[in-house]
């Protein structure tokens, strides 16, 4: 995917759901993966021509695993003129301890990681956090909710975090994972290998393969599934209805 196409899709999401307002200070949660680096690239570029000014900082939560080198990410942030910070934690070890009787520590890890990111973002005066969830993530979350919770749900474009004053935005919501992979390859993004021993062995990975198979057998099914989520009256989505749709 070319840079201008990425800008176009991200700009559409920002505008459709009023994700950015004047003088926002936005923290990008950077994991070193292709998704967060693509989001970093997109928002840092859009910042130069967006109609309202906003600030960016990039924050990586180090889970405490060995051999996790974020220096290439630091170099990219320097190139893009984005401040970069690393939060050192023992979340990897803590998650394993707390989940001894569970299939995997992923839910604990996600909860603790988000908490660390939120706290650090607040300490730097940020009022918003940009997550790098793309269209496929939104669809996969819907399937996870259906299969394992019996509910039709997926996370929304904009989410207000009660009590913290933080707002979560998802600017990659119109970008498919295949486009993210294409952008990563075209621009040689410095992806860091995920050191987590559970990487690729989760329910989400199972659902990812399921959606991929469905789309192979029924071309275009992902776009139809995404449309169903947009139009499905999910509570969190109704709360952030596009401004153009309000009366």
Feature names for model-found ranges:
Residues 3, 110, 200-203, 207, ...:
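Generic structural signal for well-ordered, non-membrane alpha-helical segments
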Residues 17, 46, 50, 214-217, ...:
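Solvent-exposed amphipathic alpha-helical surface segments
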Residues 95-98, 203-204, 234-235:
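Short, solvent-exposed polar/charged micro-motifs at secondary-structure junctions
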């Amino acid at each position: 995917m070319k840079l201008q196409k990425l800008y176009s899709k991200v700009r559409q999401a920002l505008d459709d759901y009023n994700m950015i307002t004047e003088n926002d200070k936005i923290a990008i949660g950077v994991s070193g993966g292709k998704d967060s680096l693509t989001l970093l690239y997109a928002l840092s570029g859009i910042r130069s021509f967006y109609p309202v000014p906003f600030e960016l900082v990039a924050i990586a939560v180090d889970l405490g695993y060995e051999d996790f080198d974020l220096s290439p990410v630091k170099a990219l942030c320097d190139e893009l003129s984005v401040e970069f910070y690393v939060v050192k934690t023992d979340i990897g070890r803590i998650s394993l301890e707390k989940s001894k009787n569970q299939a995997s520590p992923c839910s604990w890890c996600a909860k603790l990681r988000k908490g660390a990111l939120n706290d650090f973002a607040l300490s730097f005066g940020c009022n918003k956090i940009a997550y790098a969830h793309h269209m496929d993530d939104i669809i996969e979350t819907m399937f996870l909710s259906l299969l394992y919770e019996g509910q039709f749900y997926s996370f929304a474009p904009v989410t207000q975090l009660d009590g913290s004053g933080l707002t979560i935005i998802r600017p990659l919501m119109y970008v498919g994972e295949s486009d993210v992979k294409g952008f990563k390859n075209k621009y040689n993004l410095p992806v860091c290998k995920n050191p987590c021993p559970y990487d690729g062995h989760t329910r989400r990975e199972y659902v990812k393969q399921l959606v991929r198979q469905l789309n192979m057998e029924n071309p275009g099914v992902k776009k139809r599934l995404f449309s169903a989520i947009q139009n499905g009256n999910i509570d969190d989505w109704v709360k952030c209805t596009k401004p153009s749709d309000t009366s």
